Amino acid sequence: MGVQEMDPLTQLSLPPGFRFYPTDEELLVQYLCRKVAGHDFSLQIIAEIDLYKFDPWVLPSKAIFGEKEWYFFSPRDRKYPNGSRPNRVAGSGYWKATGTDKVITTDGRKVGIKKALVFYIGKAPKGTKTNWIMHEYRLSEPTTKTGSSRLDDWVLCRIYKKNSGGQKSSCSDLQNKDISHASSSSSSSQFDDMLESLPAIEDRYFSLPRVNSIRNFQQNDKINLQQLSSGNFDWAAMAGLNSFPELRTGNQVPTPGNQTPVLINTNQYHNHNDNLNNFNEFFANSTALNFHGEVKFEGGVDQEVESSVRAQRLNSVNPGFFQENSTGFSSSYTNSVPDPFGIRYPTQTVNMGFTG
């Protein structure tokens, strides 16, 4: 079943570099049509044999020219005397059609049909498939008379042996790997380019006054909680008094009109080891405290905030904001505590759980 190698250049005394690779249209128009019409060729490059009398591996030795593909003019016989089916039995096996027929046209006109066949060793339908392939070209119009044993006087056949499945699959795997690597690299490069093309996020969208005030409020709450755990308490900050520049230690708050100013005396609070026995005493006048302030925010956006804080008379029963009980530490809040955030603390006894 081996193929006998022959030097095509010495077969026809052809010049170096000569190759015979005709198209489907050229095979039908320039060769088969001329052969059926009885025209002679100046160069006989396609042999005339009864192809169905030989096994395919013998055909290369019958060819006039070819290295890996061999061309033949061959007649086709009828399988049945009055039938239209061709006889596909050849040598030790048979040719079996595969795929669909391809219509060949020239100048928009149908000129012939191309059919693909595979050779099987043995008898149909239990033959063994081989790698030998045939492309059969026939004209659209029948070339024989009715009643003849010949189905076609001449058809043109191309014979070749395809590569084994192992070699084909290995080449296919290499191509798939290259394609996959190239596609992944291309996708990664496109993703990087897309990220670089995105505009930078401007910081001014994150520096708005409302956002900053919420962020500062959260940070202040976190600091106050940390101070509770460490034993250092700044009750003025917790009550929201230190958020106003006028209400600082030892300062006199300016008041409009003839109102009596509020004096705030803040002492250093004792640490946790002293059991928090000494507390600040806050004295407030009986008149209301009106405070008007204007706050400007950075970030390119100015927002004017007008707040009015009115301090009411403190509970005469409890002169101080805070009072120690038997548990070691407790606090009583009143609704009179001014708060810049508009939050009023309910009047109830809160046990912090600190003991001496």
Curated annotation (Swiss-Prot):
It comes from the Eukaryota. GO terms for molecular function: DNA binding. InterPro entries: NAC-dom, NAC_dom_sf. The gene is JA2L. PANTHER family: NAC DOMAIN-CONTAINING PROTEIN 72-LIKE, PROTEIN CUP-SHAPED COTYLEDON 2-RELATED. GO terms for cellular component: nucleus. The keyword Nucleotide-binding does not apply. This is NAC domain-containing protein JA2L. It comes from Solanum lycopersicum.
